Structure formats: structure tokens, C-alpha cells
Amino acid sequence: NMDRAPIIAIIGQGSTKRLHKESHQIMDSIRMCEPISKWSQTILAAENITEIVRKAFKIAEAEKPGLCVVELPEDIAKVQIDDTPMSPTKVRRPGADHKAVAQAHELILNAKNPIILAGNGTIRKRASNRLRVLVENLGIGGINTFMAKGSVSYKDKHSLFTIGLGSGDYNNLAIDESDLVIAIGYD
């Protein structure tokens, strides 16, 4: 999941009584999914369903978002449970470090040819409007990655459009000529 989309995959599995042996349609799905997922877990007891599913959502949505796999064996899936979903926990994000903000401000003020590189995080965190205001107020050119297309509007006079893979792209030249790259939401 290179695009950093939060995904929950709930996959089936044979009965827990057959997991330890070679059996028809039994495979180690969790081990197979580990290299491509942020977290993978088998539900081995029905009373753990709510907790495991909630944890999967929390991990999938946390920075950097990605795939979480929950494996549900057929015998556990048949069990009726008397449970209610857990309430989401509100998390307050810490504020920025004042010294780091002051240093960044100083770097921007002293840069002769700065450029903003906008990544997918600007889309995920719905920061495009604030980014556009920043680009306009600072008068700094802005480049989008493929997954951040539109975070700096192509209609804006400061837009340098979307950066690609080509080594001869004008956008790459703009970055090469820059004395400060301000990466915002870039993974």
C-alpha cells in the first residue's frame, strides 16, 4: 500500500481446530500478509473481536496509514457475542516545538530560492487550503507529488505542478536550483 490509504482487510480462515495442521484451504495468511501490512492478527477468541478490530482501525489510521489484516476463523465467526463497539478515543495532538518553528522561520526568511514540496500528508490531513494560503502568502513555488495532486492548485501562479519520475522534468530542475526545500506532508 504505497499510497498510504488506511485499509482494514478482514479475511476468512478455516476453523481454529485445523490451524495447526495441513488441511484443505488452510494457509498461514498472517505470515503472508506481514511484509505488506502494518499489523496482522488472527482472532482466536470471540470475546476479543471488538478489541482487535478497534486496534486494527487505530493502527491503520495512524501516521503513516496503511493496511491492517484481521483473520477471522470460521468457528469464531459463528459465535454470537453480546458486545458493543468501543467508543473512539479522542487524541489531542501536541503543539509544535517553538524552537523548531523559530529555526524553520529563520531558514525560510534567509532562503534565496525556496520551494515547497507537498506530499500526500497534505491530502490525508485535509491541509490543502492552509497550504494554498501559505504558498500565496510566502510567494514560494509549490510542487505536488502524484498523491498530493491539487494540494497546490494548478491555477495558482506559484504552482510548479506535479513532480514525476523523469530526470529531465522542469520540476526536478526547480528543486535542484532551490536552496531550501520545505517538505510538507511528504512521506
Residue spans for each PLM region:
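N-terminal alpha/beta PP-like core and its mobile active-site loop of ThDP/TPP-dependent enzymes
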Residues: 1-187
